[in-house]
Amino acid sequence: MDTKYKDDLFRKYVQFHEGKVDTTPGNQQPGSDEYLRVAAATLLSLHKVDPLYRFRLIQFYEVVESSLRSLSSSSLSALHCAFSMLETMAINLFLFPWKKEFRSIKTYTGPFVYYVKSTLLEKDIRAILRFMGYEPELGTVYKLKELVESLQVKMVSFELFLAKVECEQMLGIHSQVKDKGYSELDVVAERKGSTEDARGCSDALRRRAESREHLTTSMARVALQKSASERAAKDYYKPRVTKPSRSVDAYDSYWESRKPPSKASLSLRKEPLAMDVGEDLKDEIIRPSPSLLAMSSSPHGSPDDLSSISSINGLGLLRSTYFSTQDDVDLYTDSEPRATYRRQDALRPDVWLVKNDTHPIYHKRSPPTKESALSKCQNCGLSCSSSLCQRCDSVLVCPSASKPSAFPSKASVHDSLAHGAPMREKYVGHQTQGLDRLAPVHSKPKPSTTATSRCGFCNRAGATNTCTQCSKVSCDACLGAYHYDPCCRKSELHKFLPNSQLNYKSAPFSQLVYR
């Protein structure tokens, strides 16, 4: 700060107030100190001047900051009034030092309490009054010392005048930037650390506010773009499965949890029921039960037979549609799906039947009647009308009429083949009782059909060999052709044995056949 300019302003300030006291007619002084205020504002706004040199005796910015932080009633306008009142005390002291009323200051009076004590801290008030020569006495009164330094009192009064003008400038800056969210304390901090004038401080605060708003807007835009991209990514990777897919293994539990249809509801159907449970498993087929084999041996199986098979199956699920046993289809070469099979083909009056699988000899016969239907022995292949084979005395397996439960036919077949003759007779007795029990329900007697197995390679009837590892069945013709086909269960070759040499001590779920 220019010292010469400040000293010149100090002399004009002292002359202005001393001229008020001089009542001589030739000494005329202006009645307003407006020119002093303008000169003081220019002094405080000099460019590139350190803020520490604006005030010499009073630490103005520290006093204002502590008051604004500590006292809720303090503000820049209140500080302006407080500095103006202290300036008046200093002016009266250096103009009228002999008057007794100015030799003491009572701090409990109304103006002092309202304008000074409610705005400035007690320590700052004590420091300013000590610069003027007052010392505290009895806690509520300040007494003037015997010796009063008139020059120091004038300098303190001039500092208080500059403090009053600086408060006016900071109020002007705050009025320009308060719409940007700045407080009076922010203005004081900016003015304390800036070497610019009042206009430069207000422009700096505005630029800082605009940059902060721009940064906030940019951050909000980035956050919105990020949230939008996250939502788009979630929508892109969101699984769009509205219902369980029938071709995915993960939803097998969905189909297993469904309740099997009751036997009564299936018996009311007039057409053969074919329930599609999804795509067939690639390397697994279900070994048909004896009752299903008995039904499939006749091309004219009734819907009642199919309903009884569905009830025996337990789950009520069939793997394919119903077709005749004489429909020789190779599972490895046939390109036409089995679903295209028409039931009208099976209901034709003239049906060509195969008599021998090894050397095919076809003969034409009329549809069999219920009286002429015979059962074929699984061991020797002889057709018999009774429940016992006339050649090898083996029990002929008939469809079971028991209740629908999970895999009931498996236990009955294995029990009848694993135990001796007493168990076989007992099994036949139970089957007879079951058929007698079903007689009132179905008015028509059921035909006795042959129970033969289909080959797991060519799907032809007459499978007489079974693999001891994976339970896959094969006919004599495919046994030589596919003997070296690897067994998928243990990655070894198949070990086929004739059915007559099997002891039927199989593991659970022996109806599963793996290809």
From Swiss-Prot:
Principal location class: cytoplasm
Cell location: Cytoplasm; Nucleus
One GO process term, biological-process aspect: regulation of inflammatory response
Chain positions of motif PIM motif: 321-338
Gene Ontology terms: cellular component: cytoplasm; fibrillar center; nucleoplasm
CDD domains linked to this entry: Bbox1 (cd19757)
Ranges for domain PUB: 78-150
Region (Disordered): 429-452
Keywords for this protein: Cytoplasm, Necrosis, Nucleus
Family: Belongs to the SPATA2 family.
Subunit description: Interacts (via the PIM motif) with RNF31/HOIP (via the PUB domain); the interaction is direct. Interacts (via the PUB domain) with CYLD; the interaction is direct.
PANTHER family named among the record's database cross-references: SPERMATOGENESIS-ASSOCIATED PROTEIN 2, SPERMATOGENESIS-ASSOCIATED PROTEIN 2/TAMOZHENNIC
Protein name (Swiss-Prot/TrEMBL): Spermatogenesis-associated protein 2
Organism: Mus musculus
Annotated gene: Spata2
